[in-house]
Amino acid sequence: MKVILASQNQHKLVELSAILSQLGFEIALESEYGLHVDVDETGTTFEENSLLKAEAVMKASGMPVLADDSGLMVDALDGAPGVYSARYGHKSSDAERIAYLLENLKDVPAERRTAKFVCVITCLWPDGRRIVARGECPGQILFAPKGTGGFGYDPVFYLPELEKTYAELAPEEKNAIYL
């Protein structure tokens, strides 16, 4: 089944395609259909933002749509950056956002650096069917980046049970967490 990913993010396309192609889904960025739908993420939850994106792209395309909203929630920062993860501290690059996060956590000891990655996926079909799923992965924030893979906050998000950051995981290892 062909599905449009409501995103311009190539990293998301690669990760989601690796998982969903096994289930018979053929995922493509909206740009591959000549679309560039700019959605103001005005929601206060990952669910709201995911739905906003899915509805806008489905309205523009008339095709089944997959949208996600995801982010990092750090307990010592009362859940920040949360839904603002991609624009945390008004920084434009992953490295700048990581530096800003680490600066905000500089006085927080290791045992209080608990966090979780949250991902909400919304699937909409033109016939009105809707599926919304939420996943959470607990971990800790390191004092410095480690690893070269992934994107976003992956280099500082540490999984104690695997003794690796997301950025140190092979794509297959990371995808296994999601399934």
Specify the residue positions occupied by each region the protein language model found.
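Anionic-ligand binding patches
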Residues: 2-4, 11-179
